[in-house]
């Protein structure tokens, strides 16, 4: 078991990571009867894609001694209304370190092997943009 999720009432859940005890709270979004006080479950899906990409790039950067510390991802998600589902996810990756062309290509390839992104429904439009420091 990786987590235990408990419904707290009022469209809010609390997920506990069993190994670490870390907690994630979700709330329904305002456009779906919620308060929007925390990540919506669909926000976590989109955010998980970015986190996965950064993690996979981190594995490659550690192996190949490439500095990507401080790299950030901005995540955008749109929902469709009928059926209500994620319509599109856009990830913008911003690198703070100066990287060679070879390192850039290596990191771009790594990001595109993210298993979370590969697991998403093919109907979801996905866009990834890379912004490298000059």
For each of these PLM feature ranges, what is it?
Residues 55:
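Short glycine/serine/threonine-rich phosphate/pyrophosphate-binding segments
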């Amino acid at each position: 078991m990786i987590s235990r999720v408990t419904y707290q009432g009022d469209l809010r859940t609390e997920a506990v990571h069993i190994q670490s005890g870390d907690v994630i709270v979700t709330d329904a979004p305002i456009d779906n009867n919620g308060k929007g006080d925390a990540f919506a479950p669909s926000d976590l899906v989109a955010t998980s894609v970015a986190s996965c990409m950064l993690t996979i790039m981190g594995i490659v950067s550690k192996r190949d001694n490439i500095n990507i510390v401080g790299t950030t991802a901005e995540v955008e998600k749109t929902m469709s209304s009928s059926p209500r589902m994620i319509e599109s996810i856009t990830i913008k990756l911003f690198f703070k370190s100066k990287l060679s062309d070879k390192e850039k290509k290596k990191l771009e390839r790594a990001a595109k092997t993210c298993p979370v992104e590969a697991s998403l429904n093919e109907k979801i439009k996905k866009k990834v943009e890379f912004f490298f420091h000059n």
